[in-house]
Every structure is written in C-alpha cells, then in structure tokens.
C-alpha cells in the first residue's frame, strides 16, 4: 500500500537504493554494513571443446579398453569471483563475511536448439530437416563459499581418462569406484578438467555450498528447457544462513549438456550451453574463527581455498554487472533511472 505524504499526495513505495552499478571494479567501492551486493556472471560450457561441442564420441568394443579422448568428455565448469576485503581488524572477536543469499540462474542459448539446417542427420528418409539436439542431458549448478566437494561414482572403473582430465584415484582403480567408495573424493578446483560422468556432488559434505541438478536419459529424448528471469532460488539453510564466502571468494560451478548433435554420417557430438548467474550477497557478522596464534601461522600457511577457473577478472572477465544497494529510497517510475549520489 502507498503511504500518505504531505496533503493528500501518496508517498512512493520504499525500495533498496542503488548506490553504484558497473563492472567487476564496482566491488572496490566501500559500502555500509547493511548494503546488498548483486553480482551477474556467466560460465562457459566445457563439453570437450571451447566451441560448445565435443569431438566425435567414440565407443570401445570392450569395457576394459575404454580410454576416451579428452575432447569428447564433458566436464564441469567452475570459477571463483573475488570479493573485496571487508575487515580492517581481523583480531576482533567477530568478523564480517560475505553471505550468498539468493541466486537467479538460467541456461543461455536454449533457442539455438531449433536449428534444423546446419548439417545434421536428416529426418524422413533424408528429405526432412535435420534432427535437433536430443538425447541424454544434464543441468546442474552450484553456488558456495568454497569449491564444490565431489564424490566419484563410475559406470566403468576400468575407464582411463587421459591427461589433463582428472579421474578418480591414481594408478590401479578399485571396482568399488562403481559404487560409493569414500576413498575417491575431490574438490572442484580446476575448470574443465573434472569429467561429469564420473564425479558428482558429495552429499556428505558441501555444507557451505548449495547445488541443484537434474538428468534425463534416453538415446533420443527431446530437450525440455525452461527459461525466465523471474525465478529466484533462496540459498539460506534451515537456520537462515547462506553460504559464507571463505577468503572473500564466491565459487560457482555448472554442468549444462543439452544432448547430442548427430551429423549426416550418424556421428554424435555432445552439445553444451552456457549458464548465467545473478547472485545477491550481504554482509554477515560471524565469530572470528582465527585466534591470534592462528593468524601468525597463516603467514606461512595458505588457508584460503583456491581454484583455477574461468576468468572473472581483467579484460576477459565474465562478470556482467555488479550492483550495490544501501539504505532505502522512494520507488522510481523508471527502473533504469540514474541512482542518486551517495550522501
């Protein structure tokens, strides 16, 4: 409901006041403890090649000889977005940490699947249009304060993944890799190197990460993909706490394989699509987990999680836009009106 101002004129509805908007450099702007930061970024797919496709999918006659090429195995995408340091004194009993509150995300390029004229295998005895992308597909994403924890579970424990891909274990692999063997775990710390087919999110860990996914199988399953900018996923747990960004870093990962493309010779190629993220963060007061003695040790020990991910800094940064909100102001009739200068 609108509020009454002077006389009979209604007051505008109060909404968060936009403090500043821009690229990754906006994160350097100092903001108050009650400010809200929104980061827009995207992750490119890693189906095998950087063009969004894999090379031809090969099949071995015997499982014990399975050794796929590195360019035909879809892998997880991941990145770390650096956040500004918000604590001037880390010896205090309490600290401020970035907390991921909500995310809007969608797969980009869904409409490209309608292409039926670019050399695909033709329907109706070679007289119809080309088959669109179809078959097995997976859609997955995660948002966390540290890298995603992974648990191995393979279809064939004899599969050998060539370098630089990272498969479960080293050397001779146990057959228990085909079920849940807790000896085969990892962290998603490198972009495009962890095969989706043998690594899944670890349900026993990931307390500081929220992940979501679904898979549809079948050799010719038609793709069913929805896209909208109105769906928000809340990242808070049952205690009202979202992922806390350790080391002032926000970690994103994705796996979006829309199916396979079939050429006119019947050869199949995986097709990957990029994913867009819009994450809202706030500042959360937490108990200082680092005693003074630990701070001294940290001079010699790297305590912060690291990741070799997609570019989120520099000229090739995949951060689309950053918004910082602080305080409240009257609702404007135009969404894109320039923000008021900070007082």
Swiss-Prot record:
GO molecular function, one term: structural molecule activity
Function recorded in the entry: Forms an icosahedral capsid with a T=7 symmetry and a 46-48 nm diameter. The capsid is composed of 72 pentamers linked to each other by disulfide bonds and associated with VP2 or VP3 proteins. Interacts with sialic acids on the cell surface to provide virion attachment to target cell. Once attached, the virion is internalized by endocytosis and traffics to the endoplasmic reticulum. Inside the endoplasmic reticulum, the protein folding machinery isomerizes VP1 interpentamer disulfide bonds, thereby triggering initial uncoating.
Chief location: virion
Family designation: Belongs to the polyomaviruses coat protein VP1 family.
Protein source organism: Budgerigar fledgling disease virus
Subcellular localization(s) per the UniProt record: Virion; Host nucleus
Keyword Chloroplast (UniProt): no
Domain commentary: The N-terminal region contains a nuclear signal but the presence of VP2 and VP3 proteins is required for efficient nuclear transport.
One GO location term (cellular component): T=7 icosahedral viral capsid
Gene3D superfamilies per UniProt: Capsid protein VP1,Polyomavirus
UniProt xrefs under Pfam families: Polyoma_coat
Keywords: Capsid protein, Disulfide bond, Host nucleus, Host-virus interaction, Late protein, T=7 icosahedral capsid protein, Viral attachment to host cell, Viral penetration into host cytoplasm, Virion, Virus endocytosis by host, Virus entry into host cell
Subunit organization: Homomultimer; disulfide-linked. The virus capsid is composed of 72 icosahedral units, each one composed of five disulfide-linked copies of VP1. Interacts with minor capsid proteins VP2 and VP3.
Gene Ontology BP term (one): virion attachment to host cell
Name listed for the protein in its UniProt record: Major capsid protein VP1
